[in-house]
């Protein structure tokens, strides 16, 4: 009886499928996020699921060594809701000059999301906004030197970013 079926592989999440379509390999849960930052990305409720993650920086480092690359994409799902993607960039926020770097990284990421092979990741990113969440997050790696209401904070807000924060809670 060599007719036994192999056990079915677990169904890929929408985030994992979207990553594959973009030619990338998603890691399970939040595991693509560097260990020291992983615990600082959390769901507002305990039943939030992390459906996959991408290390964009590592994926494009060789092809685009000089680019200001965004770091991490994370798939999330809340009960009864559509899966969505958020993008997290751990980066120093100690000086105002870092704002330009973050905005350059955001330009890079949005350029990727506009490419045809990233269409599914863009749709998941749009689903994030449709559920009332910020799509892009600057995670401060230390002291935050950017004050709410400052010119720099306003520049970030104009691009859909909150001022940097040491935790990302969605």
Segments and roles (model prediction):
Residues 1-65:
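Acidic-basic catalytic patches of nuclease active cores, encompassing PD-(D/E)XK
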Residues 60-64, 92-97, 143-148:
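Short acidic, S/G/P-rich loop/turn micro-motifs used as interaction or catalytic elements
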Residues 123-170:
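Domain-level recognition of nuclease-like catalytic cores that cleave nucleotide substrates
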Residues 67, 77-79:
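Ser/Thr/Pro-rich, acidic low-complexity intrinsically disordered regulatory segments
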Residues 72-74, 84-95:
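Conserved catalytic cores of phosphodiester-cleaving nucleases, focusing on short active-site segments
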Residues 94-113:
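Mg2+/Mn2+-dependent nuclease catalytic core
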Residues 66-70, 109:
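Conserved alpha/beta core surface patches that mediate binding of polyanionic ligands
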Residues 110-130:
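Short, basic/hydrophobic alpha-helical segments
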């Amino acid at each position: 009886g060599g007719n036994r079926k192999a056990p079915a592989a677990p169904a890929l999440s929408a985030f994992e499928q979207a990553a594959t379509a973009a030619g990338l390999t998603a890691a399970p849960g939040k595991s693509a996020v560097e260990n020291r930052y992983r615990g600082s990305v959390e769901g507002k409720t305990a039943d939030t699921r992390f459906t996959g993650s991408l290390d964009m920086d590592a994926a494009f480092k060789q092809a685009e060594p000089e680019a200001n690359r965004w770091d991490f994409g994370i798939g999330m799902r809340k009960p009864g809701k559509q899966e969505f993607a958020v993008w997290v960039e751990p980066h120093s926020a100690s000086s105002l000059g870092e704002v330009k770097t973050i905005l350059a990284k955001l330009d890079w990421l949005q350029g990727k999301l506009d490419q045809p092979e990233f269409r599914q990741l863009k749709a998941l990113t749009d689903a994030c906004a449709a559920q009332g969440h910020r799509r892009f997050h600057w995670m401060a790696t230390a002291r935050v030197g950017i004050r709410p209401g400052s010119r720099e904070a306003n520049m970030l807000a104009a691009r859909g970013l909150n001022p940097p924060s040491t935790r990302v809670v969605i």
